[in-house]
Amino acid sequence: MSLLLIHGTVKRSLEMKTVMRFTKGKEKIKKNKAINSTDEGKGRHRKVIRIGAFALVFVVLFSFVSTFFKMTDAVNIATIEGFYKEPKNTIDVMMIGASEVYADYSATEAWKNYGYTSYSLGVSGAPGSLYKSMLREALTRQHPKVVVFEVNGFLQNDSYYDRTVKLHSWIDNIHNEENRLDTIKEIVPKDEQDNFTNPLKLYHSNWKDIDKCAHTFATRVGMYFAKTSCMKGFSSIAKYSDCPSGKQKKLYFTDKSRAYMTDLLEYCKAQGVEKVLFARFPHEKEIKNPQVLCDVKELVESYGYDFASFEGDKEFIGINERDDFYNSEHLNINGSLKFTAFMGKYLSDNYRLNADHSPEIQSAWGECARRADKVISACAKDTDLSLGNHYFEMSVYLPYNFSSSLATNKVADTNNEAKPAKELNTPVKK
């Protein structure tokens, strides 16, 4: 009996020890699993961080490379970027068009003499097909009292619309992504749209022209850090035109141009833009077929907007081909100051532009005008010597020779036969 009792006690003791060993083993396994799970979680977390950091570095490098190799004209870059520096809803007059609007008209001079604010949103060689996009971009930030379109972009033959390098100058540099994509769909041929939506595909070979890339990149960096645009888009080349006197130019107003202008007029109406002036600025060559301007005038006025050609007003303005042009298409600093004085009075008289800006805006514009005056004075002195230096926004911040090198290291010829400054030296006109 006692042996059976002892045997049972020993058996139960062994069973209890077995259960305890099993329980401890199970707990140890769970603990090890928990430790392993924590280590795995930390490992996954570190992996995610590494992937995220790599992705961030890749994006930054890709963005830098894309921007560095995006080689478009420096004056266009400065003009477009400068527009975004203007405080919202502070511009009275938007000047839109090709290079005439930034070569022939100075917003700071108009401010000093007439008290209204304006901006020259121009792109060299811009065809009329871009004007709608330019207005669309302007309206994202400004509600101007008057919009002025210089019509030269509509007065060329149809091949003018096929120069994609001019389209890139605008499309690749604007900030509003929706407008950029809409513009590509509207005016770029389908077989070329990929070069606009994926610009690195187009620009990747620009490493061969590293100096030009550096020049345009320097302009982008400079405009990024600029607090405002002192020149308000204005730009000039310090020289006299060497175009032989008596030359004539034939204008075109093709069906394609008419269609683009009609679309622009419809857009102005749809957006409720009430005061619009389509204008022809003075050019050196006489017009061979002035009836073309009558056709433009008829179309514009059929929509209730204004048209004015100032080609016939050159003598009244005081502009002469000997002293006031830097090439056959653009006024030099002498001519632009004369035309700005005339245009400022014309706009003030016809559109009743009141100087009703805040003290802060008036102070800012006064400072911009002061700084622009220095650049304009330097340009006038260089023009007397026909040195050919290019003055634009970056001339406010950099030595004139260096800033000129940024502008004159062209990617392509500008609007109408404009050449790099080193090719522009001509004898001083007496």
Segments from the language model and where they lie:
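Membrane-embedded segments
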Residues: E100-T183
